[in-house]
Amino acid sequence: MTHERQQRQRDPRAAQCLALVFALPAWCLGDERAAAEKVNALAQAGNDSITEQYQPAQGISGRVTIVGSDTMQPLMAKLAAAFKSFQPNTKFGVEGHGSSEAIREFMLGLSLQHRGDKSGGKGTQGASSSDLLASSRPLTEQERKGFVSHHGYEPIGIPIAMDAVAIYVHNDNPIQRLTLEQIDGIFSSTLKRSKGGHLTTWGQVGLKDQWSQQPIHLYGRNKKSGTREFFKHVALIDGELHEDVQEQPGSASEILAIAQDPLAIGYAGVGFQSSMVRIVPLAHEAEGAATLPSAETVANGRYPLARPLYLYVNKNPKEKLDPAVSEFLKFLNSRQGQETVARANFYPLTAAQISKNLELLGQSLVTARYNGR
């Protein structure tokens, strides 16, 4: 990465500009009717409907600490804010520094979050453990075993939204479609899909004229990212990323880098789309139709890089779950919770997925009334 680009990324004015750029699309999606229509569209695609309204329990208070995915941080912040509109006596701490690092914290019952309410500890550190883990990938078997080894019981994991990892290019790039084989040829050093070798110029993926000899500049996420692991697993068939990938600490910084580089290509969650960049339609195979991520193409599997977003709960089976955490989980699986997912530019769950979640969580977690206890 050039010194000039590093300076631009450290410029606080660039960060402020980026915050505005990403706040605007999310705000535009905030219309209640649009969110409801998105939920209904997905329900129709799956021949089901999400009808259960959130019924707030009385007397809920306390603090909920969530660690996890950079991709999910904006989603969790919006869900927390929506929940607080029903339960104003609750407080939330949401960290989003990457799934892989957060999983380690969750396994060990740690949180690096500073807090000023002084509850649950002395001084400003306060939060010594995380209640929930937001992860853009499922826990590995080794990670599950690590959690059990430390806590003595299994974590509870549920999907709370659907997402798609999108392929982003500069807004001026005319590329109309890519296949998974081409994605492997562009990003991978191990080429488990690609039969045509490494693809290093835009002409090799179909662009002509002044684009044909231009090099492809690669951008991606760093090793703390669950999105990176998902991309390697699905798009590259557990292959390795090319050493030329310029790894970024977060999705927002990656999108900013792509917006500043006309020859760029990168991958990030669909929730980070903006007017500065463009999402490329993807096809499973060369002869197949290329699709953009949408509620329908994610639900029916036509979009190749669809994925669930997970929330893991640290619940000792011998103890009652904290009322604030339990009520928040109930909210996530309600119509209002899933409409918040839609407003955050992610895709809501189907009713079948909601039903499985409620069954897994158990009746005591999602329907109990605590009355302040």
Give the residues covered by each predicted segment.
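Structural motif marking the loop-to-transmembrane transition
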Residues: 11-14, 215
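Flexible loop/hinge segments at secondary-structure junctions
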Residues: 31-373
